[in-house]
Structure formats: structure tokens, C-alpha cells
Amino acid sequence: MKLLKYALLAIPFLYFSCSDDDDAPEPINEEEVITTMTVTLVNHQNGSDVVTMQTQDLDGDGPNEPVVTVSGPLSAGTSYAGSIQFLNEMEDPAEDITEEVQEEDDEHQVFFSASGVGMEFVYMDFDGDGNPLGTQFVLAPLGAGSGSLTITLVHEPTKPNDGLDTAGGSIDIQTTFSVTVE
């Protein structure tokens, strides 16, 4: 009888000592899967002069190298309206990651750098704090020559920053395109 009495007294203590005080974990915002980056450059002075640069890596981190293409040369002495589209073509239908990058503009930034040929870049889209995003930009080739253009999308960079070297974060996609300016 005593055992039953102690057992009945223990039940409320056990019940109230087991509370559900676990806070729900914050969702992890993982890096985007990007298989394709398409850069479209439209000449401000001649709308029919369109240069398309694309990198496509349909097997993701698989063994095949990405296919990198540039449709033609850039023209010196002019400027181009640039736009970038990011896709995940491992999904069917392909998922447009550009929308997610633009919605999470405070967590992304596109960086541009040229080597061997002079180019200026001007950001045309910004996050809510006025920091650059880079899916819309202006590119101005400064003179004729050949070189490379590297475009890098960084996830969760430090903003503001002084460029890719101080941005931190992790790289969602980075590609170097061979370019010619005539």
C-alpha cells in the first residue's frame, strides 16, 4: 500500500518535470544550388549588339567540367546594361535562383573583376540598406584587348565591404570568362 501511495505521489513530479521547453531551431538558409549562370550584356548605343556569357555545370559537383561560353566580342568605348540569371537545372523544371538571390538581397552580392583588359563596373541594384547586390549592372570596356572577366556570387558576405577579398561569406558560384574587346 505504501508503495502505491509513493508511486501516485511521484506521477505529478514526473509529469511537471518533463516540459517541452525546447525552442524550435532556427531554419538554416543553405547555399543555393546553381548549375547555370547566364550574363546578358546589351550595348547602350546599339541594342542589337548583345553579348551572352554562360557557364553551365549540369552535373553540379560531378566529374564533368562546366561548359563556359562567350557569344562574341565586346565593343570598346561604349557601355553595356548587364543582367545575370542563376538557374538550378538539376530540378525539373529548372528553378530560377535569381528570384531567391534578389529576395535575399541582404544575404548576397555579385562581385566583378577583370584581368588583362580594363573594365569598369557600376552596380544598378541594391539591398534594403543601400549595399550593392549586382544582378543588374553596367559594364564599360575601357579599351581594346583580351583578358578575363570573373563573376562571383557570394552568400552571406559582410556588407558593406571593400570587395571580394574582404567580403567573407561563401561562394555560391564563380566563373572566369575569356573576353575580347574590339
Language model feature labels by segment:
Residues 1-16:
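Sec-dependent bacterial lipoprotein signal peptides
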Residues 13-38:
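Bacterial Sec-dependent N-terminal signal peptides
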Residues 35-41, 101-116:
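Extended low-complexity, serine/threonine- and proline-enriched intrinsically disordered segments
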Residues 48-75:
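N-terminal edge beta-strand
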Residues 78-82:
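Short beta-strand segments enriched for Tyr within beta-sheet-rich domains
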Residues 88-96, 156-163:
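Short acidic/polar inter-strand loop motif in beta-rich domains
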Residues 114-171, 176-182:
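Helix-rich interaction surfaces within compact, conserved domain-sized segments
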